């Protein structure tokens, strides 16, 4: 479907390829480089590709995609981060529980898919963000004054007669933003229970 409320299927190789076609049509560049196989047993070449991030609830669905290569079979074992799950065609997947779904946001409850813990609710909708190089940017604004430290030395009081508790806090600056909307795509899927 085209509306979030009609989502009732897991990610498929066809849907992934449609997302990749969209990025390529916008001339998005790959983020990762080729990883060559090694003489070690059962290692494989990994194509250059885009990066996709999603909830770890989708691990099983991604692993079941045709052509999935787990990180354990990467030739050089060079991962993007500790949470990289694997690669399918020219997409490398990073999964983590921090990427949460829209609970009960999809089609009517179906025992096949996760439904936010409520047996009467709708299917949970999981976003998959896929992006190319320089689709977004971020920077910590730094110089000698970027970190502002606040220190409150301990003082004796009725609640702290020995003056043992003080506080220390810091503030800093950070900026991020989308640099090219055409180089980021979002697919919305259900996750198999």
Predicted regions and their residues:
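Sequence/fold signature of self-assembling virion shell proteins
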Residues: 2-37, 48-53, 57-193
